[in-house]
Amino acid sequence: MHYSQMRWMFFCLTALLHGSFIVNAAKILVYCPSISKSHVLLCSKYADLLHNAGHDTVLFIPSYSKLLDNYDGAKHAKVWRLHNVTEAYDTKLGTLANVMENSHIGFIDRLTFDADFWIDMCADLLGKLPEMQHIIDYKFDLVIYNEIDPCTPAIVRLFNIPKTVLLSSEAIMDKVAWNLGLPTLPSYVPSVEENPNHDRMSFFERMSNVYKFFQSIVVHYLQDIHVLNLFRKEVSSDFPSIAEIIRNVSLVLVNTDEIFDLPRSYSSKFVYVGMLEAGKDENVTLPKKQDDYFKKGKSGSVFVSFGTVTPFRSLPERIQLSILNAIQKLPDYHFVVKTTADDESSAQFFSTVQNVDLVDWVPQKAVLRHANLKLFVSHGGMNSVLETMYYGVPMVIMPVFTDQFRNGRNVERRGAGKMVLRETVVKETFFDAIHSVLEEKSYSSSVKRISHLMKNKPFTSEERVTKWIDFVLKYETSEHFDLESNNLSIIEHNHLDLFFYLCIISLLNFVVYRKIFKRKSQS
C-alpha cells in the first residue's frame, strides 16, 4: 500500500474515533456550594473523574464562604464561580464555639439554627439568579448536586437540565429516603443526623432513634416549605415542591462504602460509591519536615485533626485540656495536631509540651500511609473516615455535626476505634479512649480487615460512577428504578387503612356475636 494511502487511512480512522468520542461526550454540571473544603474536594473528585471519562464537565461553585474563594480542588474539570453570594454562612460559623458547647441540638434549636443558616442564604442565592444565566445557556445534559443545602434542588431546577443525579455526601439521608419512598425502619436503621446510635439498639436507644428520625423528617419538611414559599413568591406560583424535585432524580450516588456502612434496605436508584481515587497519589509523600514529625515517638505517632470547619482553637477549653492531658500522659507517642497557620493560641497552649508538633496542612493520604502512624483522632467526617478505613488506621472520633455521630458509632460497631461525645469530655476522657485503642490489638486487626475488604471489592468506585452516569445519560430509568411507594399516601404506605378496616370488621363481628350469644342465653 502506498504511503499516502496509509496516511489517509490513518487520518480517517483518527477522525472516526474522535467523532465517536464527541458523540458519546455529554455536558455535565457538578453544582457545589462552598460549604466546606472537604465538601468542595468531594465534588471536585466527581468533576475530574467525569472529565477524564471524556465528558465536558464543569464544576460550579456558588461562594458561601469567602474562606474558600480561592479553593476548588479540581485538577482537570473546568471551574466556574459565583462570588459574593452571601455573608450568612461565615457569620453563622462565628457561633461555632457555642454549638460545640451544646450537649445536643434540640428540636426548637434545630429549627431556629437551620432557618437562620440555610433559608437566609437561599434568598441571597436566588437574588443572584441573573448571574447564572450562562449555566442555562450552556445547555447541560446532566447535573450532579448535593442534598445538604435545601435550596440546591430548587436552584438546579431553574437550569432546565434534562437529567439530574443526587450526590449524598453522607450515608443515605433520612429526608432522601423519605422523599424517594425508601423503607427506613428506626428499629435497626439509625437516623443519620446528630444521632450516636448504630443498628443494635436498646429499648431507650430505639426510643431516641425514633425521635431523631421524626425530628429529621419534620425539620427538613419545614425547611422545604420555607424554600418552596420563597420560590413560589419570587419565581412561579406553581413551582414544584422540593420532595417532587428530588423524587425525579435519575440516580443517587451515595458517598459511603457498604463494607463500612451499616446494612439497610435500598432501591436500584441508589449506588454506593465509596472512596474515590482510592490508591491514587501513592507516590505523594510528606514534606521532609512533616515526615520527621511522624517519625518521632518511640511507640509511634498520632494524628489529631477535627477538619477544616473545626480548627483546634475553636474547641472548648475543657476539650483542649483533655487532649493535652492525653498527650502528656503518653510520652512514648508523638502527636501531630492540625490547626491553622495563624493559630498563635494553640502554639502557646502546647509550647511546653515535648511530644507534640503543630501543622496547618498535610496531605492526609500520605499521613495515613505513614508507617509510624498508629492512630487518627478525628471529627469523623465521611471522607476522612473512608480514607482512614481504606488505609487500615484505628480511630478515636469526637463528632461535631450531622452524620459524624453516626460515623463515629459505626467505627465502634466495626471494632475499628472509639467515639467520645463532646458533652461527656472531662480531663481523662481522651486519655482513656486513645490509650485503649493504642494498646488493644483488636482495634488494629479489625480495621485492617475492613481495609482488605474495601481494597478487594469487585468493582472500583470510579467504575460505578462512570458506568452508571453513562447509563442514565443514555436511558430513561424512572420506570425501572422508581419505587411505587412514591405514589402511596402515608395511610397506604403504613397500612393504616387496612388496620382501620380490620378494626371495623372485628368490632362488627364482636357486636354480632355478642347479640347472638345474648339471644341464646335469653332463650
UniProtKB/Swiss-Prot annotation:
EC number: 2.4.1.17
Signal peptide, first to last residue: 1-25
GO MF term list: glucuronosyltransferase activity; UDP-glycosyltransferase activity
Glycosylation sites noted in the Swiss-Prot or TrEMBL record: 84, 248, 283, 487
PROSITE patterns tied to this protein: UDPGT (PS00375)
Transmembrane residue ranges: 490-508
InterPro entries recorded: UDP-glycosyltransferase (IPR050271), UDP_glucos_trans (IPR002213), UDP_glycos_trans_CS (IPR035595)
Localization per record: Membrane
Domain of life: Eukaryota
Keywords: Glycoprotein, Glycosyltransferase, Membrane, Signal, Transferase, Transmembrane, Transmembrane helix
Keyword Lipid biosynthesis annotated: no
Reactions mediated catalytically: glucuronate acceptor + UDP-alpha-D-glucuronate = acceptor beta-D-glucuronoside + UDP + H(+)
GO cellular component, one term: membrane
Membrane topology: Single-pass membrane protein
Keyword Membrane among UniProt keywords: yes
Enzyme class per UniProt: transferase
Gene3D superfamilies xrefs: Glycogen Phosphorylase B
Family stated for the protein in its record: Belongs to the UDP-glycosyltransferase family.
Protein name: Putative UDP-glucuronosyltransferase ugt-50
Gene: ugt-50
